[in-house]
Amino acid sequence: MDPSSLSNPQECKVTSLNLVLSVNFEKSQLQGYVEVASQIVKEGTESLILDTNQLEISHCNDVTSNPINFKLSEEHKVFGKALIISIPEGLRSVGKEFIVRVYYNTTVDSNALQWLTKDQTAGKLHPYLFSQCQAIHARSLVPCQDSPSNKVKYQAEITVPKPLTALMSALSTGKTESTDSSVFTFTQEIPIPTYLIAIVVGDLESRVIGPRSKVWSEPSMVAAAEYEFANTEKFIAVGEDLLTPYVWGRYDILLLPPSFPYGGMENPLLTFVTPTLLAGDRSLEGVVAHEIAHSWCGNLVTNKYWSEFFLNEGFTVFVERKILGRLYGEEMFDFEAMNGLKHLHDDVDLFTHKHQEELTALIPNLNGIDPDDAFSSVPYEKGFNLLCYLQSLVGVADFEAWLKSYISKFSYQSIVATQMKDYFIEYFTEKGKSEQISVVNWNDWFNKPGMPIEQVVFVSPAAKVAKDLAEITWIKDQGVNATKDDIKSFKTQQIILFLDTLIHSTSEKPLSVDVLEKMDSLYGFTDVVNSEYKFRWQTLCLHSGLKRIEPKVVEFLISQGRMKFVRPLYRELNKVNPELAKSTFNKYKSQYHIIASKMVAKDLGL
Ligand SMILES: [Zn+2]
């Protein structure tokens, strides 16, 4: 049983959804019905139970329009309401198919959906809609069995006002037009967990960026996006080489409006990304490697429950770093691993400080907990470290062969960690390596809170160069020997590490304003486009009290709404100029995604 869902796939399993919806921008609603096909898996099951959250259900019919009885449960504040639909008596035996149409509409409180007004878009001419269903928000878009343990196919028929375009995490199968609206149809033939259902509606244009890829965005950003993501096919090709053939057909990228609160979301066939990746020089294209790695880890082999999230994210980070290593030099794997370990350290400290240490176990107990509240780098980085440790026991070549085999064995399934463990043991016992792997303390790896129990040592000379520049040239020697050429040959990750090291190592004793001015005159950080540099540089300046950075910070805060940047920057600005932080937020809060504006308000004590 999935503790994050109220539904009953273990009794009556949903196999496909057919969404027939129209998009109403005036009311900020999706309206229509979903046809749910299900199959009885437990003899005598009387009801099909679906998850819903903040939906208005009007009625249920069978396919011949006869009414079907249903009721809604009491509301659970995190998991929503169960929609309990009576299965007709003749259809309650194992193997029988039950099809029901649920007529409903979403509401303004459906938190999977963000409705943007014209003014909140880049073009300012048309409204815009996008969804974010992970982890448990699909139930506020469509009544469904909203558990990653159950995979479904889906079709959709979406009516939108002209001249807007609809896209989904599915193959596009056509478009028909009437006087003032267009109908877009889609099909997703590969069963997916419901958190991967995605929709976007807006003034969208596309450019071809590869043999199976297009990039989509509002017209004003499409040329920049085309340039930035031109290397996408290389990442997919390395992924295929490492793992198995790419099965989804297309791999498109959707560049969202600036208020998209996340970095990226691996919706199948259509990765969603933030426009803060537009650096103008492809220096942030590596983020796409992560989303591409999800095409196998997560989207094909899926965590059965959210407590096993490391099966999605730990594996994805591992594959992402393998891809980056192959494309940018093997050292990049260790370099990124070292950075990741630092983030893991920070999060373990943070959760321990909040007395939530149990959430730092690789498989935490999420009973009654919103998976979003447990979110941290733990499943990503601790999961990654487990795989590095296992790799160190059996050797790189054999581990990569196992990984390929693991993906092909568990593709199209939802699994738990013990299945992964059992397959690892089975595979390497057969290969005569049972002694090497007998040392693994699986129980502690999976269940013990805190840092990884075994630590693989990562080595990166490039990281040392970046750290030395921060610690010796700038912190110790105050920049007296610094020159313009210091960072000329640095890779993106080195500049990020350089700035991170400065931030961390000067948190007690900030650099002086004079030192920062010198750094800026040599490296030109104030005017960079790269959002990762800008975010760190502004943090550093606020911390040192460099007043002239404040208007630049405001400019950055109101130009995008990615939580990774806006939350910490508002907090820093609030420390040095609370009036400016609060007035800026109050003036622009409607521009942010609802989740982001709630979080920032909390951070600012509003
Ligand atoms: Zn991910």
Curated annotation (Swiss-Prot):
SUPFAM superfamilies per record: ARM repeat, Leukotriene A4 hydrolase N-terminal domain, Metalloproteases ('zincins'), catalytic domain
Key words of the record: Cytoplasm, Hydrolase, Leukotriene biosynthesis, Metal-binding, Metalloprotease, Protease, Zinc
GO molecular function, one term: metallopeptidase activity
Location within or outside the cell: Cytoplasm
Cofactor(s) the protein requires to work: Zn(2+)
Positions with a binding annotation for a peptide: Q132, C133, Q134, P261, Y262, G263, G264, M265, E266
Cofactor note: Binds 1 zinc ion per subunit.
InterPro entries for this protein: Aminopeptidase_N-like_N (IPR045357), Aminopeptidase_N-like_N_sf (IPR042097), ARM-type_fold (IPR016024), LTA4H_cat (IPR049980), M1_LTA-4_hydro/amino_C_sf (IPR038502), M1_LTA4H (IPR034015), Peptidase_M1 (IPR001930), Peptidase_M1_C (IPR015211)
A GO biological process held by the record: peptide catabolic process
E.C. numbers: 3.4.11.-, 3.3.2.10
Domain of life: Eukaryota
Active site positions, chain numbering: E291, Y380
Family, as annotated: Belongs to the peptidase M1 family.
PANTHER family in alphabetical order: LEUKOTRIENE A-4 HYDROLASE
Function description: Aminopeptidase that preferentially cleaves di- and tripeptides. Also has low epoxide hydrolase activity (in vitro). Can hydrolyze the epoxide leukotriene LTA(4) but it forms preferentially 5,6-dihydroxy-7,9,11,14-eicosatetraenoic acid rather than the cytokine leukotriene B(4) as the product compared to the homologous mammalian enzyme (in vitro).
Protein name, entry field: Leucine aminopeptidase
Organism: Dictyostelium discoideum (Social amoeba)
